[in-house]
Regions:
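N-terminal cap/leader regions of alpha/beta-hydrolase-fold enzymes
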Residues: 1-160
Length: 160
C-alpha cells in the first residue's frame, strides 16, 4: 500500500490502466463504469476521481482521505464518500481538506459522515475499538442504501 500512498502519480496510472482495460472487454458499456472501494480501495476510488479520468461515479466506504501534495485535474466524476465520524484514520482536517478540494475542483460530490461510527463499519468481523475498527450495522445498511441510490442516479434506474 505504501508505494501507492506516497507515489500518487503511479497509483493513478495503475488505476486508469485497470479501468481502461475493463472498458475494452466485450459486453462492457464504457459509458457506465463506477468504482467502489473500501478502506485503501476507498482511497483508490477518490484518487481515480481526482485523476480527471471520466467515470460515471466513484464511491468510497471508510476510505483513507489523506491528500497528496500534487495538483489535481478538474474532477469529472461524481463522488460519494461514506465515512465514520469516529474513524481514527481520518481526521476532521482531512475531511475539511477533501471538501475544499472537491469544491475547488468543481466536482459533483457528497460526503456522509455517520455518527458514532468507526473505521471498517461495513465489515461484520471488525470488532477492535482499540484499533478503531468496529462494525456498525446501522451505518453499514445506511451506507449501502446511499450507494445504491447514488448508482441509480449516475446510471439511471436499470430496473425500469
Amino acid at each position: 500500500i505504501e508505494p501507492f500512498v506516497t507515489d500518487r502519480k503511479l497509483f493513478r496510472q495503475r488505476l486508469i490502466s485497470a479501468v481502461d482495460y475493463g472498458k475494452s472487454l466485450d459486453g462492457i458499456d464504457a459509458s457506465k463504469i463506477a468504482m467502489i472501494g473500501f478502506c485503501f480501495g476507498g482511497l483508490a476510488s477518490i484518487e481515480l476521481a481526482r485523476s480527471g479520468h471520466n467515470l460515471s461515479g466513484c464511491v468510497s466506504f471508510h476510505g483513507l482521505l489523506n491528500q497528496s501534495d500534487e495538483t489535481f485535474n478538474k474532477v469529472n466524476t461524481k463522488l460519494l464518500v461514506l465515512n465514520g465520524d469516529l474513524d481514527p484514520m481520518v481526521s476532521s482536517e482531512q475531511i475539511l481538506a477533501l471538501q475544499n478540494e472537491m469544491t475547488e475542483s468543481e466536482a459533483d460530490w457528497q460526503l456522509i459522515n455517520y455518527g458514532n461510527t468507526y473505521h471498517a463499519f461495513t465489515n461484520p468481523l471488525a470488532n477492535d475499538v482499540a484499533m478503531g475498527t468496529v462494525y456498525n450495522h446501522d451505518s453499514d445498511e445506511r451506507s449501502w442504501i446511499a450507494m445504491t441510490n447514488f448508482l441509480e442516479e449516475v446510471f439511471g434506474n436499470v430496473n425500469k
